[in-house]
């Protein structure tokens, strides 16, 4: 069973992986806890200690928006994938993706809702980006965009900036999903851009990614497709699920777990009437509990229920007195990013309504109690020690190799009942790595605890610059990834718009039509998640 994380998979268009694509810039020297107070940057030492929690959160939003503006080309309205701490145009990454473009669009709406920019500026920015999108090369039969573009021109990348490595244009199901979600938000929230946003969205065929003949009854979503011969050695097959235009090269990889950011594509297909609702129940909650599946992280417990004619094993993992439906890696991003747009907890109170707050609690308890880091919030991010890495809480992931929470990749292994003995049920953790965007997502469920955690990250660790929170920080060494990632900053903006702006993202996305089509589907389910 081949599994590729979304953020790794979007790089599949490269013939070879370019080293250091998102290389972080560690601090010149590691900072010991005792030395932190004397080594804090002047920028954040000057922050007022008397500001209210709401004022502090709005300041965080304002500075985060500053980084997104700095990433965005003033001629095309396209954001770069990332930018260094300098926020200088010369330090932009030189490439962007549909996810990044979508993130900038919903961030502009969030900035307006938070009163950081005017209605007029929001409309101008959004329309500029949409006008560029309308001219960009894409897969015309499906309306889907390719994975990498030059943000300064909008041209499809065929060679990687800085290395010259060949790029094979690839249409990713989940990256187009985030662009689609953003277009839905814009269509509802920005009247001056509604027509163009609607035109771009309406041409997107989500069933292009839907494989009704996949291994799971109900069908699964492909990772994506190439519309020209793929890189040598790629695992693909040719076909065309919508029967329009030439055949494409589909990935043999599918997204088959529910607690994943990739469920946004299933949602959009169901909303559009292009993917049958039962596809939502084709994905695993956990894998089965038998010894044949003992390769997964731990042994789930649960019962089988039937929805829309499909039997679903409602498994959950046990962690610190909680029963939680795990993701693939145990990251906040997998659990909560779709919830920025779809009010999952209220629409599905017996499933997501249990799992979301339990996942947040589990991440907090892992960082503060089990690992003793003193900070929490674990999700894929820039690696403070160079590059990019998936971070998470290993115990909350199906993947036995984990998304680990520390630099040392400390592996939690509780065993699998009588099938596999435990090798490391009570680990000793090392230099934990937290990413602020995880705490902003968590703020939708634990606002006070998340804000307190972020305040400590800013004041005690100094992981803050002119563009808001730096992407990640190792809490014991004090090593900081001094860079801003477009997607992570956009998750911060979307979360703040919900927390401070009266669920602005959800209100714009979850229209009556969306509710009629999606809420009955996700609302019928009962997860195995619960607190003891």
Give each language-model segment a name.
Residues 21-38:
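C-terminal region of N-terminal signal peptides and the immediate post-cleavage residues
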Residues 16-17, 24, 147, 396:
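Intrinsically disordered, low-complexity, compositionally biased regions/tails
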Residues 39-532:
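Ser/Thr/Asn(+Pro)-rich, low-complexity disordered segments
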Residues 1, 7, 28-29, 42:
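Low-complexity, intrinsically disordered short peptide segments enriched in small/polar/basic residues
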Residues 18-19, 501:
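Residue-level marker of structural boundaries
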Residues 16, 23-24, 118, 506:
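Short, polar/charged, Gly/Pro-enriched helix-capping and turn/loop motifs at alpha-helix termini
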């Amino acid at each position: 069973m081949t599994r590729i994380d979304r953020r790794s998979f979007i790089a599949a268009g490269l013939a070879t992986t370019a080293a250091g694509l998102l290389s972080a810039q560690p601090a010149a020297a590691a900072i010991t806890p005792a030395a932190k107070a004397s080594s804090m940057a002047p920028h954040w030492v000057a922050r007022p200690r008397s500001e209210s929690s709401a004022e502090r959160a709005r300041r965080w939003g304002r500075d985060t928006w500053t980084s997104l503006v700095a990433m965005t080309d003033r001629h095309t309205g396209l954001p770069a994938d990332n930018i260094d701490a300098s926020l200088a145009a010369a330090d932009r990454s030189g490439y962007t993706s549909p996810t990044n473009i979508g993130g900038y669009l919903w961030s502009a709406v969030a900035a307006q809702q938070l009163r950081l920019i005017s209605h007029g500026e929001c409309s101008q920015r959004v329309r500029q980006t949409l006008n560029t999108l309308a001219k960009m090369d894409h897969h015309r039969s499906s309306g889907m965009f390719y994975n990498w573009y030059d943000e300064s021109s909008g041209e499809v990348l065929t060679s990687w900036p800085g290395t010259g490595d060949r790029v094979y244009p690839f249409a990713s199901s989940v990256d187009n999903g985030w662009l689609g979600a953003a277009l839905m938000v814009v269509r509802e929230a920005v009247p001056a851009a509604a027509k163009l946003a609607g035109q771009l969205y309406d041409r997107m065929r989500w069933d292009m990614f839907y494989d009704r003949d996949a291994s799971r009854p109900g069908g699964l979503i492909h990772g994506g497709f190439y519309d020209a011969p793929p890189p040598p050695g790629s695992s693909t097959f040719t076909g065309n699920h919508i029967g329009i235009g030439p055949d494409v090269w589909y990935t043999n990889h599918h997204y088959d777990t529910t607690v994943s950011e990739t469920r946004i594509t299933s949602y959009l297909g169901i909303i559009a009437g292009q993917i049958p609702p039962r596809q939502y129940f084709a994905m695993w909650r956990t894998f089965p509990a038998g010894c044949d599946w003992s390769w997964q992280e731990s042994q789930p417990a649960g019962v089988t229920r039937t929805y829309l004619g499909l039997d679903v094993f409602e498994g959950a993992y046990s962690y610190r007195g909680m029963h939680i439906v795990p993701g693939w890696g145990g990251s906040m991003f997998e659990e909560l990013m779709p919830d920025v747009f779809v009010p999952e907890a209220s629409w599905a109170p017996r499933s997501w309504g249990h799992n979301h707050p339990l996942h947040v609690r589990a991440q907090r308890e892992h960082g503060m109690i089990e690992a003793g880091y003193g900070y929490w919030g674990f999700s894929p991010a820039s690696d403070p020690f160079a590059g990019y890495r998936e971070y998470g809480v290993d115990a909350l992931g199906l993947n036995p190799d984990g998304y680990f929470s520390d630099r040392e990749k400390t592996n939690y292994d509780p065993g699998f009942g009588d099938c596999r003995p435990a090798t490391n049920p009570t680990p000793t953790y090392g230099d934990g790595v937290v990413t602020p965007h995880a705490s902003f997502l968590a703020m939708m469920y634990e606002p006070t605890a998340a804000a307190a955690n972020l305040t400590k990250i800013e004041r005690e660790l100094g992981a803050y610059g002119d563009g808001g929170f730096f992407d990640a920080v190792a809490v014991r060494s004090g090593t900081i990834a001094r860079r801003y990632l477009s997607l992570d900053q956009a998750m911060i903006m979307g979360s703040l718009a919900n927390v401070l702006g009266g669920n602005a993202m959800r209100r714009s996305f979850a229209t009556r039509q969306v509710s009629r089509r999606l809420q009955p589907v996700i609302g019928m389910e009962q997860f195995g998640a619960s607190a003891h």
